[in-house]
């Protein structure tokens, strides 16, 4: 839905695009703690959600692509080879909501940004489809039917994997999603919150 919307309306101020982005991001966040199996192949989880980005790799990578008018901007097939920081939902957030990147340049730059939005959303769709296919064609069956010759040898090992994912997800929320922006009493750091530019932090 996000990629389709972007093909029809790639303006970063488009309400339809913003709504589709938020819906797609919500879908990912609900499953983002399941960091095993298909999400870990080819760093797919990072390709969808490269955060935290303490060194500013995402805006730097996107700025380079746009200022150098890199041909990869118009090539969804090749875009999977760019820096992982320039991919996924946080790259889209910068393109849509960052004051500098969303307003950068002249009319030609606006066309490039529009094309990049379309390419990033197609890349998100491709990565998401690969994860879904991995679950549907193979990995779900491994969890449901453990076997001594399979990834999971018993129901107990399946439960351990799921419990580990849950605990790790809760720790990430506590230490990173909440801990980073809270900082200290004397020095809170709200701009370290996840997805603060799009006003989504509390949804995560």
Language-model regions, residue ranges each:
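Mature extracytoplasmic or organellar-lumen-exposed domains after removal of signal/transit peptides
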Residues: 1-204
């Amino acid at each position: 839905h996000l990629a389709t919307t972007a093909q029809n309306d790639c303006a970063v101020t488009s309400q339809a695009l913003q709504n589709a982005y938020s819906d797609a991001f919500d879908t990912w966040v609900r499953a983002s703690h399941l960091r095993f199996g298909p999400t870990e192949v080819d760093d797919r989880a990072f390709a969808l959600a490269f955060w935290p980005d303490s060194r500013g790799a995402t805006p730097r990578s996107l700025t380079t692509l746009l200022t150098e008018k890199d041909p990869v901007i118009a090539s969804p097939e090749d875009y999977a080879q760019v820096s992982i920081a320039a991919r996924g939902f946080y790259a889209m957030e910068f393109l849509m909501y960052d004051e500098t990147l969303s307003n950068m340049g002249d009319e030609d730059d606006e066309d490039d940004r529009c094309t990049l939005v379309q390419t990033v959303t197609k890349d998100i769709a491709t990565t998401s489809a690969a994860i879904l296919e991995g679950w549907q064609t193979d990995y779900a069956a491994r969890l449901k039917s453990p076997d001594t010759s399979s990834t999971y040898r018993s129901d107990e090992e399946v439960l351990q994997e799921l419990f580990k994912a849950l605990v790790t997800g809760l720790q990430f929320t506590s230490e990173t999603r909440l801990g980073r922006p809270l900082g200290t009493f004397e020095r809170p750091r709200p701009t370290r919150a996840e997805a603060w530019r799009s006003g989504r932090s509390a949804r995560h």
